[in-house]
Design a protein with these regions (language model features):
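N-terminal-proximal low-complexity accessory segments that begin disordered
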Residues: 1-67
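Structured, mid-chain assembly/scaffold modules that mediate subunit interfaces
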Residues: 45-207
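A contiguous, surface-oriented mixed alpha/beta subdomain in the mid-to-C-terminal portion of proteins
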Residues: 212-216
Length: 216
């Protein structure tokens, strides 16, 4: 039986010169995860209003999302009413309104579009689709101007269980109105954990959550 060859290990010798595996010298040996602190709404508002790069980051994807329009289809076939619907929506400048709502969602973590529909009911009552004639106007609200009133769906079998069914909206003049959620198109913000969403009163993430250090 032959002699076992000795294995020469000079890792420690080499590492002493290269720094490999040494935490203080090898950037791949260890790393720290720094958590970002969410910006206050006013900080985001100022950033979006006065920082040109921040505004582009918010608005360009929002504008692109609506630039091609859309069509109504059944399977792969466009339905007969599609062009009529688009014509009606163009009359109320749907693309500008949706781009604005998407921009506020990206910037603030949430927004909503109030659909002004004459169905013979009050704003705080559920929308009656059978009596609804047409969408007369679309009004956009940022997350800052929307608050749940404390009324929630309580039936566990309801797909909307736990969600608010009544919101208070405040316009630019300070006037407020209670609105049933069926009259709103809600944009709930970027994907975050349920725990973080609870911390943010049901709203989601913003584009500034992960890039704020590069802008401030």
């Amino acid at each position: 039986m032959g002699k076992k060859k000795k294995t020469l290990r000079n890792d420690g010798f080499v590492n002493a010169f290269t720094g490999q595996g040494v935490k203080s010298r090898d950037p791949f040996a260890s790393y720290n995860v720094d958590s970002e602190i969410p910006l206050y709404d006013k900080e985001i508002d100022n950033l979006y209003t006065y920082n040109g790069i921040a505004r582009k980051i918010v608005e360009i994807p929002a504008d692109d999302a609506v630039s091609e329009g859309f069509k109504l289809v059944n399977g792969s076939d466009e339905i007969e009413q599609s062009k009529l619907v688009m014509s009606e929506l163009e009359d109320i400048k749907w693309d500008n309104k949706f781009s604005e709502a998407l921009s506020w969602e990206r910037a603030m973590g949430g927004s909503a579009i109030l659909m002004m529909i004459n169905d013979g009911r009050r704003f705080d009552e559920p929308l009656d689709l059978k009596s609804a004639d047409k969408i007369e106007r679309l009004d956009v609200y940022s997350k800052q101007d929307i608050s749940a009133t404390g009324s929630y769906y309580s039936d566990p079998s309801d797909p909307k269980y736990g969600r608010p069914y009544m919101y208070t909206l405040i316009n630019e003049y300070g006037n407020s109105i209670n609105v049933h959620e069926s009259r709103l198109l809600l944009f709930r913000g970027g994907r975050i954990s349920k725990e973080e969403r609870r911390f943010r009163d049901g709203w989601g993430g913003t584009v500034f959550d992960v890039i704020q250090r590069r802008l401030i």
